[in-house]
């Protein structure tokens, strides 16, 4: 049994295929590099290949800095079959490689020039000669998707099943890149559909992973039928790959066409195709597998003690998928894997707070414990989902679990002990949570400094503080002077509480206020950003005070016209906020947050803080 917490997100096959993909990208880059000729040199070469007289006088030993001979250049710069024949008769070797590792035949194939390919082959070029990466000319034609070039090579006896340095045949490459017509041609010339690559991958594995349905169908045709249940070195079958990457049409084709697919087969990690669909949030694929093949896969656990339900909770971004799996009435929401961990453990460990809330609302038991399988049998290390969240620094989830703590539990609501442990308590911020918060805050501040226009950057030395005119949990508000203007200064305390810090609110508030410009919204003057201990937001000072002060402290009586002026100005400010490209909702519109320039005189101003603003997507 494997340790869930050490479950790899990438398999060995994934790592290998990434390297294979990179190698083919490099191959194309090297081919393109060979095709790059300096403009002056290119003009001269075109003149040579465009004139029989000039060509007859050319130095046969000529070559470029990249090691391109005249034979290579003939394939790039407008040469013809006559030039090829002449150069080869005069002794230029077609086997010579450029510094990037390609013959003239490779370059002619990459340029898709059937005439030059034929001429080179008739002149004695080795059709099976390998260049960079163990690639033959047929491999190059397949990578580029050049149907005509591939056809000429096959007509002249190219080995259709030859393998390159990563043991890919041309058919592997055609399936990988989705070259349907080239695939059809290769099959016509007898390509082996079941030959294995370096990690046991067949062309059908590649087509299934990349989502090429038509190629998958070609590979399954009678006469060259691929083994639909063939396993690679990690026991993946094609259904594993199309399920993992969400290729619903291929999943449906494999399951519905009497192909004798084994839908519940497992890889070396114990994953069924349904597991992989759920680990990657492929809801439609998961539904298709269950609807066609039944619910057998739902009860299977992989080596990390996870059912498909656990897998969906590990992914955590599709509550609809989790709900669908629970609706099958096969797995209980509190089902524990062999190591004891539940879907709630998985969601907590990966920080999926919305899923955690959904599971708790639907009866998930936060007191169930998991055991660490890496410990020896004599040691008992039982952990609740809260401990898993705490370990990963997901402090918001720890706080949420506090809210949902069962009333019969005797521990205080703000402290937790580990069941079966030594009674030690956990509290937020967790060590990792604190590090995450600090790292995020530093990044947020740097981004804010970079994005805030320079005229909004203030130094604390530029500000003259006068009397205090307000206070709150964030700090204090002062009346003062800045750049020869009377202003209001909101001075922050640089402390962190719970899971949301003043730094976060400060950055949020500044980033929004700096974009606002309307006569009925308090004007932003600037901010001090140098250090959290000096954080301050400077805004326009409104001399008339708040509407609350006017009505309840000064006991002023407003006439109807003044009330209408105030109401209209507030509405104008709200309309401006709501009609921004990214609309803003003022979530706490009350008398304390409406300020008056002077008694009964417009404009009246809306005051926004990080607590009262809410951004809507455009």
Swiss-Prot record:
Instruction: Give the positions of lipid attachment, kind N-myristoyl glycine.
Output: 2
Specify which residues bind ATP according to the UniProt entry for this protein.
469-477, 490
- This chain belongs to the protein called Serine/threonine-protein kinase TNNI3K
User: What are the GO cellular component annotations?
Assistant: cytoplasm; nucleus
- Positions in coiled-coil regions: 21-51
Top-level division of the source organism's lineage: Eukaryota
Q: Where is the signal peptide?
A: none
Q: Which reaction does it catalyse?
A: L-seryl-[protein] + ATP = O-phospho-L-seryl-[protein] + ADP + H(+); L-threonyl-[protein] + ATP = O-phospho-L-threonyl-[protein] + ADP + H(+)
Q: Which terms does the record give in the GO molecular function aspect?
A: ATP binding; metal ion binding; protein serine kinase activity; protein serine/threonine kinase activity
Q: How is it modified after translation?
A: Autophosphorylated.
Q: Which residues form the active site?
A: 588
What organism does this protein naturally occur in?
A: Pongo abelii
Q: How does it assemble?
A: Interacts with TNNI3, ACTC, ACTA1, MYBPC3, AIP, FABP3 and HADHB.
Which family would the database say this protein is a member of? Belongs to the protein kinase superfamily. TKL Ser/Thr protein kinase family. MAP kinase kinase kinase subfamily.
Record-linked PROSITE patterns = ANK_REP_REGION, ANK_REPEAT, PROTEIN_KINASE_ATP, PROTEIN_KINASE_DOM
Name its cellular compartments: Nucleus; Cytoplasm
Q: Which PANTHER family match?
A: ANKYRIN REPEAT CONTAINING, ANKYRIN REPEAT DOMAIN-CONTAINING PROTEIN 16
- Mark the ANK repeats by their residue spans: 66-96, 100-129, 133-162, 166-195, 199-228, 234-263, 269-298, 304-335, 339-368, 381-410
Function recorded in the entry: May play a role in cardiac physiology.
Keywords, comma-separated and alphabetical: ANK repeat, ATP-binding, Coiled coil, Cytoplasm, Kinase, Lipoprotein, Magnesium, Metal-binding, Myristate, Nucleotide-binding, Nucleus, Phosphoprotein, Repeat, Serine/threonine-protein kinase, Transferase
Q: Which residues form the Protein kinase domain?
A: 463-618
Q: What is the lineage of its organism?
A: Eukaryota, Metazoa, Chordata, Craniata, Vertebrata
Q: Which InterPro entries match?
A: Ankyrin_rpt, Ankyrin_rpt-contain_sf, Kinase-like_dom_sf, Prot_kinase_dom, Protein_kinase_ATP_BS, Ser-Thr/Tyr_kinase_cat_dom
